[in-house]
From Swiss-Prot:
Source domain of life: Eukaryota
Location in the cell: Cytoplasm; Secreted, Cell wall
Lineage, uppermost ranks: Eukaryota, Viridiplantae, Streptophyta, Embryophyta, Tracheophyta
Xref: InterPro entries: ECP63-like_dom
Keywords: Cell wall, Cytoplasm, Repeat, Secreted
GO biological process: cold acclimation
Organism whose genome encodes this protein: Daucus carota (Wild carrot)
Protein name, as recorded: Embryonic protein DC-8
Length: 555
């Protein structure tokens, strides 16, 4: 738990550091945006020379030079400014592209870290799940083993109880059997005793009858003797004695029969009672044995059912635990998968958002550079047109003044005009040659700038392609925008290029009669004491600057 908190704190610190770095870079970019581009213009002053003619010539030469500067120099300045703006826009675009690539790389690194963290978490959860599953499996096996042991114990206990019940039943049956035998023996002994007693009673009755018969016989003899003594009484006593003897005999026989019947009846009753008791004890013993057997079977069934119930409960508990761990494993796997997908989605959204921000930033910078370039080009164009107009007016005024002076002093300046015209022609040719040379240099410089920009754009495109492949193609748009902005800055808008290419300066002096300028220059030189060789007519005194059109290739 502590390691997870430390890891979370480290992630928060890294995220805060990245946010501070991004805020600092944004602040620097805003400061650079507020600074803008400063353009310094230098003005050159032309010092005048001695003399009116020299001043006029220098004025004319200055006018021609300024006209050349309008055609060549201002275009060069505009090209320099455009190139500086292009370089600035290119540098800013490249910086924006580098920043965007760096941010994309950081976002990629963060996404990779998030992915690694998520995979680590998934591995931990997977290991934890596997560990829990293994523990559940071991626990289930342990439960099964315990259940098996319990079942064995219950089985042994059931067998023991069954054995004990069987032994108890056999013991009870033996006891009941012994009890029945004992009771039968006791009944037999009782019957024998009763029979002996009855026999004894019969003997006693028999002895009693014999005794009574003897007594009666004695009494009869006595009576007979008495009767014999009494003559009259002899017959009566004899009858009486016979009668009494018969009565005693009948009574004895009756008593003997009664005792015999009683003894037989008692013997039969005792025998019946003994048999009935034996039968009852036998049935009781069988009933007890059956009850003991039923109780034993019931106990065995109960223990068997209890063992089966315990085994089923243990199995159900094991299955439930296994199912719970399985559900827990599936839930953890689903949560880990959802967390992984969420982290990947957040990293992807962050990367796309950062790429969009850097793309917008690069596009904004390119647009600002383009606007600055267009504005500078427009200002240069307006300045060039204004300068051309001023120079044209100034040249026309100077030409008019010169013509006026020349017309007033025709004879004085006639000889000097040829030399001055020749010098002006040579100066014009030199200026034209220098202008052409400058145009060629500018053309070569523009081609070099184009080639350099093309190489830079190609290298940046390759770098952007590599970085864009690593960032899943999201940087191509930003680098493409920067590239388009750079190309736009290099090539400039078509209307601006057309205006730049088609700028021309034509200084036209009012036509005069042939020799008028030469005469005026000669007269002026003679007036100031300067001599020169007359070279003749110079033709039409008209200065025309050729228009140079160049084509710029597209990158």
């Amino acid at each position: 738990m502590a390691s997870r908190k430390d890891e979370r704190a480290a992630k928060e610190e890294r995220a805060q550091a990245a946010a501070e770095l991004a805020a600092k870079e944004l602040r620097d970019v805003n400061q650079d945006r507020e600074r803008g581009i400063k353009v310094v213009e230098h003005k050159e002053e032309v010092s005048g020379g001695p003399g009116v003619i020299g001043s006029i010539l220098k004025s004319v030469q200055g006018t021609l030079g300024q006209a050349k500067e309008v055609v060549v120099g201002k275009a060069h300045d505009t090209a320099e400014v455009s190139r500086e703006n292009t370089d600035y826009a290119y540098d800013k675009g490249r910086e924006g592209g580098d920043v965007a690539a760096q941010k994309a790389e950081e976002a990629k690194e963060k996404a990779k870290m998030a992915k690694d963290t998520t995979m680590g978490k998934a591995g931990e959860y997977k290991d934890y799940t596997a560990q829990k599953a293994e523990e559940a499996k071991e626990k289930a096996a342990q439960k099964a083993e315990e259940t098996k042991e319990k079942a064995g114990e219950y089985k042994n206990y059931t067998a023991q109880k069954a054995g004990e019940a069987k032994d108890t039943t056999l013991g009870k049956a033996g006891e009941y059997k012994d009890y029945a035998a004992q009771k039968a023996a006791e009944a037999k002994d009782t019957t024998a005793q009763k029979a002996a007693e009855a026999k004894e009673k019969t003997g006693e009755y028999k002895d009693y009858a014999a005794q009574k018969a003897a007594e009666a016989k004695v009494l009869a003899a006595q009576k007979a003797a008495e009767a014999k003594d009494t003559t009259g009484k002899d017959g009566e006593y004899k009858d009486y004695a016979a009668q009494k003897a018969a009565e005693a005999k009948d009574a004895t026989m009756q008593k003997t029969g009664e005792y015999k019947d009683y003894a037989a009846q008692k013997t039969a009753e005792t025998k019946d009672a003994t048999m009935e008791k034996a039968k009852e004890y036998k049935e009781y013993a069988a009933q007890k044995a059956a009850e003991a057997k039923d109780a034993t079977m019931q106990k065995t069934g109960e223990y068997k059912d209890y063992s089966a119930q315990k085994a089923a409960e243990t199995k159900d508990a094991t299955m439930e635990k296994t199912k719970e761990y399985k559900d827990y494993t599936a839930q953890k796997a689903a949560e880990t998968k959802d967390a992984t997908m969420e982290k990947a989605k957040e990293a992807k959204d962050t990367t796309v958002q950062k790429t969009g921000e850097y793309k917008d930033y690069a596009a904004e910078k390119a647009k600002e550079g383009k606007d600055v370039t267009v504005e500078k080009a427009k200002e240069g164009k307006d300045t060039t047109v204004g300068k051309m107009t001023e120079l044209k007016d100034s040249a026309a005024d100077a030409a008019r003044k010169a013509m006026d002076m020349f017309l007033g002093k025709k004879e004085e300046v006639k000889g000097k005009a040829g030399e001055t015209a020749e010098a002006a022609k040579e100066k014009y040719e030199d200026t034209e040659f220098a202008a052409r040379k400058k145009m060629e240099e500018l053309k070569l410089q523009e081609e070099g700038v184009k080639d350099e920009a093309k190489q830079r754009a190609e290298a940046d495109r390759e770098t952007a392609g590599d970085r864009g492949s690593a960032a899943k193609g999201t940087i191509f748009g930003a680098m493409g925008s920067v590239k388009d902005a750079i190309v736009g800055k290099l090539t400039m808008p078509s209307d601006v290029v057309k205006d730049k290419q088609q700028q021309e300066a034509v200084i036209k002096v009012d036509e005069t009669r042939p020799g008028a300028v030469a005469e005026a220059l000669k007269a002026a030189d003679q007036m100031h004491g300067q001599a020169f060789n007359d070279v003749g007519k110079m033709g039409d005194e008209e200065v025309i600057v050729e228009r140079k059109e160049t084509r710029q290739g597209k990158m």
